[in-house]
């Protein structure tokens, strides 16, 4: 129902992937077919707000060009020296990407998380909803056991944003919180190494704010 709603009412479009569930071996888990990604998006659709979209992480691009592992991109790039079809495909992709860099100084056709952010931003902007950047969340506003908004920071100091229908903390987990991941991941407890391509600033602030507001956090990955 959620996917149908977003595709019907917003700019969101999804495509299936070949990814397994995170835990395909548990009851109800599936080895393939359930996961979806945002459909690739041309960010010129954002108009004057296009420069506000943060570029993708360099670690998941090739000279700034994004791939979508659910389509033919990776297959062709792996086979471009073995197949004429793949060679032509890769050549066209590279030429188009170089044009984008020359004209816009960044990739225009984005995939995965960048496409998700761009499509959600386009949907919000079309509805007249302001998108505040450089406005870090400070704490969840809690009155009489009810979440009523967020306190945020900014150039003019802290201010409160009130919410009548709830608050969504979409903060990307806690991949750079050394103490928390040490408790959460069994491979670290057994002496293994943990590497993440996420920004170093992604230290779990959202999780801590939720806990402070009284939320239950389950760190079991089993």
Language-model features: where?
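Glycine-rich loop(s) and the adjacent beta-strand/alpha-helix scaffold that form part
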Residues: 107-114, 126, 154-222
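Conserved redox-cofactor binding core of oxidoreductases
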Residues: 2-157
């Amino acid at each position: 129902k959620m996917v149908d709603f977003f595709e019907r009412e917003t700019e969101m479009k999804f495509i299936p992937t070949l990814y397994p569930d995170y835990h395909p071996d548990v009851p109800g888990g599936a080895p393939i077919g359930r996961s979806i990604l945002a459909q690739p998006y041309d960010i010129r659709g954002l108009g004057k707000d296009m420069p506000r979209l943060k570029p993708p992480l360099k670690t998941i691009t090739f000279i700034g060009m994004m791939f979508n592992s659910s389509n033919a991109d990776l297959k062709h790039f792996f086979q471009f020296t073995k197949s004429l079809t793949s060679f032509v495909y890769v050549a066209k992709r590279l030429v188009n990407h170089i044009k984008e860099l020359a004209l816009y100084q960044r990739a225009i056709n984005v995939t995965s998380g960048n496409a998700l952010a761009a499509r959600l931003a386009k949907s919000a902007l079309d509805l007249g909803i302001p998108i505040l950047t450089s406005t870090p969340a400070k704490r969840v506003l809690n009155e009489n056991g009810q979440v009523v908004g967020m306190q945020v920071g900014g150039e003019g100091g802290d201010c409160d944003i009130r919410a009548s229908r709830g608050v969504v903390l979409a903060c990307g987990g806690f991949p750079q919180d050394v103490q928390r991941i040490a408790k959460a991941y069994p491979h670290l407890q057994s002496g293994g190494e943990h590497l993440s391509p996420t920004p170093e600033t992604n230290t779990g602030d959202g999780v801590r704010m939720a806990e402070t507001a009284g939320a239950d956090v389950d760190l079991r990955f089993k």
